[in-house]
């Protein structure tokens, strides 16, 4: 069985794991949205502590929607989203499109981009102070830049473009109308997504310089839940090696009424949101601080997020697996291993708290929004060293065995109805070698056993008459290049593919390759090569698809080399190879004031489209949210919509549909 191990072990781990290390013949080991809006490759920027706050005068930026009038936000900077921090403000547009979008300050249009996904139609204005404001999900660009874009579209014969401009090409004044608001790209409804970035492309909180008079906020953040989690193998919370979640029964709750028992190294987690006046949207917090017995332990401020690589690090800032399985977004109030962000202020423990037996710890959490509204939370931890007490229950009639992995700890849970006749120990096996684990504690009728996997991976786990195979093939450390190969696949991990150590789990069955679980997150892409067990006949129309739990398939692609196909992925999950031989569908649904086509594809999805009118190219715009292709108005460059026309659409597999029309 292939394995990967790190070269050294800290003294504490060695003392815990040495017996099994020697038994197995192993050497001791240790453990270390938003999509990008440009095709340019960036190297992740290293974190070096909290970033300096840019000096911007209060009132320098104009609110770009309805300036001078009361307005509302649909989302604030730093909201916790799957795979990204929300990078700016979502400004409401009265539920409609085509509101004027004003330049927030003097500067010049430095860039624009069009896409059916992500930011949609997006404009960038660079200002004399070096900052850039970003305006996303636009419906239309206005002014001379719109004409330059249209010429480029016809020159390249494609709608989606990215253009960069010099300082003197398209200057703008503060308050100049530069675009009309929209609902393009990944938007779920009409609004303006507005960002402020610095010269290094860090996303900055636009509210950090005094806010805007148009946006009022007198509402303090609201606590939804907090949690205490064991972070070391000897740690317990309420006597167990489990995260304990505490949900207030009344709102607001500022003092938790019950003392929480704990021991060992623990971390605090928080679920909370903020609201603005007269708006029901749940927004993010700007700052969270933690003090223990009056001394600072941890703080973070979401005013500066590196883009694009830093924003995906939200998956390490929150408990990603808990969010995926329990639907509750808990942000860690400690800096977890592999978290590259620089928005934290901590001491040497990085926000972790070591709880000792018999001592009391008063924990104060302070939640703040960008307008200075504050909500406190206070709770008490009391140190209680765990002790093993044997329990029995007549409710369990047969032995049972299951296991799970939390960080580096293997947690074995075994039901033992009769400890008098059966051994109370669980056994880890590797070949002919074995290690007996004594129970760490019991809960109801179950024994719980804890083992640090950095000491070596077992082949199987035995309890009484039950033996189960341990289905993790290798330990993959983060921070290094690592490879894994078997008869069905190859995996290639880069130095920044993983946030932290991975205990690799792969399988192949009935044409489906499973790599880990989607409950776990990747930082940068993982390279995979799939090795089909039979020859794939039509490779030109066959590709890799991500298969969800309900059997739905999403196109991934891949490059064929012989009978193997390689691709990159940002997600774990189930992958299959499928062949798409059916062309896309297209239907003309409107001629009024232009052409509107409804398009669809049964598997791989739309790849390209082209409309020729009288043999000349005519621009079409694609909107994936409602699966339509349509002509834009005005369009003074393309041919008029009269006479014979041909629409040609192609899917990702190369299947083509041609429709001839007489306009």
Language-model features: where?
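Bacterial N-terminal signal peptides
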Residues: 17-27
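C-terminal beta-strand-rich structural cap/linker in extracellular carbohydrate-active enzymes
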Residues: 453-464, 564-583
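Short edge beta-strand/loop segments characteristic of extracellular beta-sandwich folds
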Residues: 269-273, 410-417, 529-533, 594-602
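Proline-enriched interdomain boundary motifs that mark the N-terminal boundary
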Residues: 220-225, 388-397, 582-588
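Short beta-strand elements
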Residues: 373-390, 465-487, 659-663
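Proteolytic processing hotspots in large secreted/extracellular or virion-associated proteins
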Residues: 476-478, 498-545
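Surface-exposed, glycine-biased beta-strand/turn segments
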Residues: 34-132, 141-144, 158-168, 173-174, ...
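Long, low-complexity serine/threonine/glycine- and acidic-rich segments characteristic of extracellular
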Residues: 173, 216, 231-234, 239-387, ...
């Amino acid at each position: 069985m292939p394995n990967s191990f790190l070269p050294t072990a800290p003294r504490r781990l060695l003392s815990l794991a040495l017996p099994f290390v020697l038994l197995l013949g192993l050497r001791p080991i240790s453990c270390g949205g938003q999509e990008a809006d440009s095709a340019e490759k960036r190297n992740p920027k290293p974190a070096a502590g909290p970033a300096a706050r840019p000096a911007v005068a209060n009132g320098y930026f104009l609110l770009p929607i309805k300036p001078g009038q009361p307005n509302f936000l649909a989302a604030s900077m730093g909201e916790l989203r799957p795979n990204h921090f929300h990078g700016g403000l979502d400004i409401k547009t009265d539920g409609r499109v085509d509101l004027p979008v004003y330049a927030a300050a003097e500067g010049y249009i430095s860039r624009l981009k069009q896409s059916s996904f992500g930011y949609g139609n997006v404009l960038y204005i660079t200002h004399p102070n070096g900052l850039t404001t970003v305006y996303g999900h636009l419906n239309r660009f206005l002014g001379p830049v719109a004409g330059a874009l249209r010429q480029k579209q016809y020159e390249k014969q494609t709608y989606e473009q990215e253009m960069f401009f010099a300082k003197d090409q398209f200057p703008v004044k503060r308050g100049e109308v530069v675009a009309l608001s929209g609902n393009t790209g990944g938007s779920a409804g009409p609004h303006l997504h507005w960002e402020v970035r610095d010269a290094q492309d860090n996303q900055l909180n636009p509210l950090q310089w005094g806010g805007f008079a148009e946006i009022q906020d007198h509402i303090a953040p609201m606590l939804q839940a907090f949690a205490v989690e064991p972070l070391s193998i000897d740690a317990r919370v309420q006597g167990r090696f489990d995260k304990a979640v505490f949900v207030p029964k009344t709102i607001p709750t500022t003092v938790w009424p019950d003392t929480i028992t704990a021991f060992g190294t623990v971390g605090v987690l928080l679920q909370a949101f903020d609201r603005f006046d007269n708006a029901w949207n749940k927004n993010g917090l700007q700052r969270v601080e933690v003090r223990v017995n009056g001394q600072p332990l941890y703080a973070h401020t979401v005013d500066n997020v590196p883009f694009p690589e830093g924003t995906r690090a939200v998956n390490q800032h929150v408990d990603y697996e808990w969010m995926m399985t329990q639907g509750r977004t808990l942000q860690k109030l400690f800096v977890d291993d592999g978290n590259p962000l620089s928005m934290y202020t901590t001491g040497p423990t990085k926000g972790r708290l070591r709880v000792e037996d018999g001592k009391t710890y008063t924990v104060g959490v302070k939640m703040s929004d960008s307008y200075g509204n504050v909500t406190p939370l206070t709770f008490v931890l009391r140190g209680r060293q765990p002790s093993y007490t044997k329990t029995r229950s007549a409710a369990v009639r047969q032995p049972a065995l299951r296991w799970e992995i939390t960080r580096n700890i293997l947690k074995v849970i075994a039901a033992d109805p009769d400890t008098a006749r059966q051994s109370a120990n669980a056994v880890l096996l590797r070949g002919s070698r074995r290690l007996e684990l004594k129970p760490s504690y019991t809960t109801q009728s179950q024994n719980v056993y804890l083992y640090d996997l950095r000491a070596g991976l077992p082949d199987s786990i035995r309890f009484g008459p039950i033996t189960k195979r341990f289905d993790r093939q290798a330990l993959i450390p983060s921070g290094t290049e690592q490879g894994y190969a078997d008869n069905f696949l190859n995996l290639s991990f880069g130095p920044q593919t993983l946030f932290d150590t991975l205990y690799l789990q792969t399988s192949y069955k009935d044409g489906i390759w499973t790599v880990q679980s989607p409950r776990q997150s990747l930082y940068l892409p993982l390279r995979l090569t799939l090795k089909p067990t039979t020859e794939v006949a039509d490779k030109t129309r066959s590709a890799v698809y991500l298969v969800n739990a309900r059997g739905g398939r999403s196109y991934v692609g891949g490059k064929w080399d012989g009978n193997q196909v390689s691709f990159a992925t940002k997600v774990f999950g189930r992958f299959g190879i499928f062949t798409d031989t059916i062309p896309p569908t297209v239907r003309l649904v409107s001629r009024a004031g232009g052409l509107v086509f409804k398009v669809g594809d049964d598997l791989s999805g739309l790849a390209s489209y082209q409309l020729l009118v009288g043999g000349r190219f005519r621009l079409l715009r694609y909107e994936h949210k409602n699966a339509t292709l349509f002509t834009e108005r005005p369009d003074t460059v393309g041919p008029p919509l009269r006479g014979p026309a041909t629409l040609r659409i192609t899917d990702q597999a190369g299947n083509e549909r041609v429709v001839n029309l007489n306009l």
